[in-house]
Every structure is written in C-alpha cells, then in structure tokens.
Amino acid sequence: MVRTLDSPRHEALRTFLIERRNKAGLRQVDLAKRLRRSQSYVTYVETGQKLVDVVELMEWADAIGFDANEAIKRLSRTPKR
C-alpha cells in the first residue's frame, strides 16, 4: 500500500500550495505569520513531512487568497496511484 505522504494526490496538493504561495508573493515565514504557525510547520507541509486536513487547507486558502474548492477539484483529477 502506498503511504499517503508519497501519494500522487498529496504531491499534487503540496505543489498546488507552493504554487499559490509563490503566486501570492509570500515567503514561508510570511505565510507562517498569517497562519499563526511556525515557519517549520509550513516547511513540513511543503516538503511532505506533514499532511494538512480540510480545516488546515481552508486556513491556507484564507491566508493566501485562493478557493479551497479549487484545490480539491485539482486533486480529484489526480490519479490515486
């Protein structure tokens, strides 16, 4: 069984979050401040060392300025394996 952290969908989510952060012109430390989290939290998510749940995805969306549904739609088009 494929570990969740290594799944194509998780990779797609990480890529999406990094793209959105960069598009917003935010550094990891800037996003961390908006999320009221540490920079290491952002790093762990972006490097696949930590999963984000739906609530966290919504927090990232609010902090960066994107629609969380857009991320979910993108993930739904990504193969499971």
Residue spans for each PLM region:
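Recognition helix of helix-turn-helix/homeodomain-like DNA-binding domains
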Residues: L35-V52
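Residues at secondary-structure transition points
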Residues: T4, P8-A12, L51, V55, ...
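Short basic helix-loop element that most often maps to the first helix and adjoining turn
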Residues: T15-R34, E59
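DNA major-groove recognition helix of helix-turn-helix/homeodomain DNA-binding modules
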Residues: R36, V55-A71
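Helix-turn-helix/winged-helix DNA-binding modules
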Residues: K23, Q49-V52, A63
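Short, charged recognition helix plus adjacent turn
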Residues: V2-R3, E70-R81
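A short, Lys/Arg-rich alpha-helix, primarily the initiator
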Residues: M1-K23
